[in-house]
A protein has these predicted regions:
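Conserved alpha/beta-domain cores
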Residues: 1-171, 179, 191
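Divalent-metal-activated hydrolytic enzyme cores
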Residues: 182-184, 189
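Short, charged, intrinsically disordered terminal tails
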Residues: 193-196
Length: 197
């Protein structure tokens, strides 16, 4: 829903959609205030100064990959007496233009999040390079493999809630689902009149 306004969100809700993603804190705040009963996901770049606003409205933050952001989320969530669900963003493809930690750093960040009483790591997120569905599938299978490794490392109690793989967008969601995605981000396919696969 990051490219549309409140009226379009209302139409989507009437059609049965209840999960929406925003990449700007001010848009998250506006739309979550209009529809507080819906599930609001933050999918944008996390900035320290915006974390209190994001935590106030997001059910899940998809784009966490720095330890100091985890600590800031812990502080903001504690003030709200809330446990904030997060995904660790991993840059599987190694593209410099993409956010996310290196795959080798993901487990350490999950453990940092597990050590915070008001942060709950729910899984991993990645974005694939655009334009090549074969490379996209390789990216997604790489994240799925890392996800399984981390679940084994963190043990049974914590792996019960570490269940989500957020990957795949409007142009490559089929490859993501084939690789094991539990969440896909398909706003353009839903909201854009000009989108074609």
């Amino acid at each position: 829903s990051k490219t549309v306004g409140v009226p379009e969100v209302a139409l989507a809700i009437s059609a049965g959609d209840h999960d929406f993603g925003e990449n700007r804190p001010e848009c998250l705040e506006e739309k979550a205030a209009a529809f507080p009963q819906e599930n609001w996901h933050f999918i944008g770049n996390v900035q320290s100064r915006a974390i209190p606003h994001i935590v106030q409205h997001a059910c899940l933050i998809h784009s966490v990959y720095q330890e100091h952001h985890i600590q800031a989320i812990e502080k903001a969530a504690a003030k709200l007496d809330k446990v904030q669900d997060v995904l660790i963003e991993v840059n599987v493809s190694g593209e410099e233009s993409k956010g996310g930690c290196a795959p080798a750093d993901a487990l350490a960040l999950v453990k940092v999040a597990l050590s915070c009483p008001h942060v709950r790591p729910r899984g991993l997120m990645t974005m694939a390079p655009q334009g090549d569905k074969h490379i996209a599938f390789e990216t997604f299978t790489g994240l799925a493999s890392l996800f399984r490794q981390i679940r084994q490392e963190i043990g049974e109690n914590d792996s019960d809630t570490f269940t989500e793989l957020s990957m795949g967008m409007s142009e490559d969601w089929r490859e993501a689902v084939a690789a094991g995605a539990t969440m896909i981000r398909v706003g353009r396919a839903i909201f854009s009149d000009s989108f074609t696969e």
